[in-house]
Amino acid sequence: MPTEFLYTSKIAAISWAATGGRQQRVYFQDLNGKIREAQRGGDNPWTGGSSQNVIGEAKLFSPLAAVTWKSAQGIQIRVYCVNKDNILSEFVYDGSKWITGQLGSVGVKVGSNSKLAALQWGGSESAPPNIRVYYQKSNGSGSSIHEYVWSGKWTAGASFGSTVPGTGIGATAIGPGRLRIYYQATDNKIREHCWDSNSWYVGGFSASASAGVSIAAISWGSTPNIRVYWQKGREELYEAAYGGSWNTPGQIKDASRPTPSLPDTFIAANSSGNIDISVFFQASGVSLQQWQWISGKGWSIGAVVPTGTPAGW
């Protein structure tokens, strides 16, 4: 069946705990560059993803990133993208509606093939969030990752790393003011940069990957537990796990339901601790699907996420 899901669209994913079960949101672009939202609550089916679920518009094939937290006004969501002028932009869910955020008015220029990642910590019903958005300013080999910071207003942050052009970026906060950023260095290895409240330093993680992989990262707990994901090629999604030390990366498989992904797919991940992890990807046939980890059951292919169908179908 035809889909309105843009071929090789970037993907962003978030989740949070709620009374009715884990809430998930996934963001992607349609054929016209509109950013759509699909929703899932608990074990209920996925909904949304249609032309009625547009939250904003970005340049075609814009990178996407998202963060969420609970505030006194309800669930807050921020979705980051790049507009047609390659300016870093933001769409805000303020607990009741989607609006355009402040970041776009700052005029942060982004490299034309830059990817994005974002993280937050500290956001609660009684405290504002600290948000970080990561991007590249230029397209050349050896260019750095740059950081833009929200702590009551938007300001430029640090820059670090020496990367391949258009590197994938994964970002996660493992605790208040403790940040982990993953990117592909000029030797094609996936590297880690760390911030522990006072300075940036190169972390201990390193993994070989083919050039141009998509990267996603999640974390939970006080240990902390970290998971880094990257797509190596057709049907080759890899995971590296940290729970005090890094394991040997392994391929995620479900022998009973092989589902080929596009060789140049982009991925996004969210989790509810180690109980339920989802990694979203674009499958052959241009459907939005997920690998799902359920504690005690392992990895399996989850439900297809709705992305809309053209009128007349």
Swiss-Prot record:
Pfam family, one: Fungal_lectin
UniProt entry keywords in alphabetical sequence: Fruiting body, Lectin, Repeat
Region (6 X approximate tandem repeats): 5-304
Residue sites binding beta-L-fucose 1 per the record: 25, 37, 98
Biotechnology and industry use: AAL's binding activity could be used to identify secreted fucosylated glycoproteins that may represent candidate biomarkers for cancer since fucosylation of N-linked glycans has been associated with several types of cancer such as liver cancer. Identified as one of the several suitable fluorescently labeled lectins that can be used in a combination for the visualization and quantification of extracellular glycoconjugates in dental supragingival biofilms grown for 48 hours in situ in the absence of dietary carbohydrates.
Binding residue positions for beta-L-fucose 2: 78, 90, 102, 154
Residues the entry annotates as binding beta-L-fucose 3: 132, 147, 200
Residues binding alpha-L-fucose 2, per UniProt: 180, 192, 204, 246
InterPro entries (UniProt xref): Fungal_lectin
GO biological process: defense response to fungus; reproductive fruiting body development
TM annotation in the entry: none
Binding site for beta-L-fucose 4: 227, 239, 299
UniProt effect for mutating residue 284 to D: Impairs homodimerization
Biological function: Lectin that specifically binds to L-fucose. Has strongest preference for the alpha-1,6-fucosylated chain (core fucose) on glycoproteins among alpha-1,2-, alpha-1,3-, alpha-1,4-, and alpha-1,6-fucosylated chains. Might play a role in the differentiation of the fruiting body. Exhibits antifungal activity against Mucor racemosus and thus could act as an antifungal protein in natural ecosystems.
Subunit structure: Forms homodimers. The two AAL monomers are associated via interactions between N-terminal and C-terminal peptides. Tyr-7 interacts via aromatic ring stacking with its counterpart on the other monomer, whereas Ser-284 interacts via hydrogen bonding with Asp-264 on the other monomer.
Name of the protein in its database record: Fucose-specific lectin
Organism placement in taxonomy: Eukaryota, Fungi, Dikarya, Ascomycota, Pezizomycotina
